[in-house]
Amino acid sequence: MIWDNNEDIRLEYCGTSKRAIQHVLDACRQERRPYVVITQKELGDQCYLGKSSKTERTTKETNLSTILVPVTMLEEEVYKAEICTYLARKTGAHLILLRANDYGSKAKRNIQRIITHIQTISERTGETISYEEQVAKGDSFSIHKELHNYPSEHQLVLLTASREYGLDDWLFGPPEQYVIRHSNVPVMLINPRADLFSLCD
């Protein structure tokens, strides 16, 4: 996979409990690189290859052919543009840009900015970047609850981590914790920082 032996992407393994997942999320709060979280559930019945800092875990290889990219109304969602474009170019993966079903225009504006970036890079490099836009059932506040049951054969979910934790996040866990806990595929996260690490050629 693209994160194997890739110093530009941090790889983390954890258990499936809320506490184990939150421990990883807390450890990565200041991470400038994208980071992939793989739980024991995925190691047991999915096909992924990778190394952690402490132990080496090897399973069967698989191809990264489809990436699910949910897009909400939050401004930091546009940070996904560079990362998903990079992943698509390096792996040839098809991007499913899943827009939150909001009444307002912010999610639509964010996804259009991501599409514009994809098209700009495609025109500049002459490479074909495969993508499609779909609309979720849920809005920006609930879209994360439908990702694990989304009817697409994706091998990775790309999320933006919460900028700050509110009361609900402290009590019940942030949205990214829910997605990781229920997902059957690895989840890649990027932290919304002004000095966000950019993957480049």
Regions found by a protein language model. Give the residues of each.
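A short, acidic, amphipathic alpha-helical segment used as a generic capping/interface helix at domain edges
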Residues: I118-Q119, K137-P151
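Charged docking surfaces used in two-component/phosphorelay signaling
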Residues: E12-H23, A136-H144
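A structural signal for isolated positions on well-ordered beta-strands in alpha/beta enzyme cores
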Residues: E12, L68, H94-I96, S130, ...
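Short glycine/serine/threonine/alanine-rich loop segments
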Residues: E7, R33, A93-H94, E127, ...
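Short acidic/Ser/Thr-enriched loop-to-helix initiation segments
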Residues: T59-T125, R181-S183, L196-D201
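Gly/Ser-rich helix-loop-strand patches that form or flank binding pockets
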Residues: I21-T66, N149-D201
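Active-site rim loops that border cofactor/substrate pockets in soluble metabolic enzymes
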Residues: I121-F141
